[in-house]
Amino acid sequence: MCIRDRPNAESSPEFTTYDAALDELTALSKEQRIVFVIDEYPYLAKAKPAISAMLQHIIDHKWTDSKMYLILCGSSMSFMESQVLGKESPLYGRRTAQFKIMPLDYKETAVFHPNLSEEDNALIYGITGGVPHYINKLDVRDSVDEALMENLFDRSSYLYEEPANLLKQELREPAIYNAIIKAIAEGASRLNDITTKVGEENSVVAKYLKTLIDLGIVKKETPITEKPGKKTIYLLADNFFRFWYRFVPVNASAIDSGRIAKTYPHAVKQYFPDYMGLIFEKMCQDYLLYYANDLPIELSEIGQWWGTDPKKKKQIQIDIVGTPVEGNDYIIGSCKYRNEKIGLDELELIREYAAVFGKGTNYHYYIFSKGGFTDGLLQAQERGEVQLLTPVSYTHLRAHETSL
């Protein structure tokens, strides 16, 4: 039922005050279940600062015996956490549930473009991070390249200004946050490296990093199975920020002068395989964690591991380590986003890395490859030594068939 459907209601009722509108909704909720949704609540709260106190009063005194179901939505995470969920908020203690809407994974993202190639869908996921709003704004029709030219590498486009606008909306000192994000995008991952690039003290940068982590822009990672410590690194968690800071600032001159269409092939596109490396690792991890139904162990968690090989005295990294719910069997995996076929040397390498990792008594090896596998590695799979997977379709990664 709408308000105008009620007996004696005007066809298009108008309310001169918020109290009048809320009173009408309250009356309706006495008769039937009402789901009252306020979208982008932060905008309303800024325009009408007293609205939270008004809702507090009506929740406490008028809706306790009603059938009202109130939903407050907002894209400003900092506002929702402090002004709605925070202890200082008039609404504190009155929520019955809260949901943080997470980005889509690669499989869910591909549903938006069922007619595009697997590689294009993977790239769209890598650019947008699976955020539906960004997927729609990128507006890929026939070509990702054309969509980027029109809807990102153009000063008048929505996505061109999005990171700056988000930082201004969420943060009081966007310049410092921008410098930190830029430093991480350029390869600084440890706290000391980031502070050197930013030119601030460690304690100052650590405080700002915490805020960026809370906002989901940055993530703090430690080698799986290990406690936070000297090995802790910082990465960009938001793929759209990662893409934007990787390709927009360095090409700003070409974008401003309108030369980006000419420079795009060698200044942007040729670096996509390198950029997609981390994205592909996440896709493979998600496949094992959420979609694979024939794993040899029940996974507790999945992630990366890095450390020092004491014999060779060099740093190594394992793309995928899957830990067991129980027992001492682990999954060890490698992800290669390149067109070349992967051979037996990769299997030998991850066996060496597993020995350095050293946490398990038995290891199950997985290799993901965009470009497929050599005959020798396929034969190793037939002998049960390794499981090989290729993105025959990014919407359904499946075991590589030896007949292919």
What are these language model-derived features?
Residues 1-5, 395-402:
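Conserved small/polar residues in nucleotide/adenosyl-binding loops
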Residues 4-260:
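Phosphate-binding site recognition
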Residues 239-398:
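A cross-kingdom feature that marks ATP-driven nucleic-acid transaction machinery
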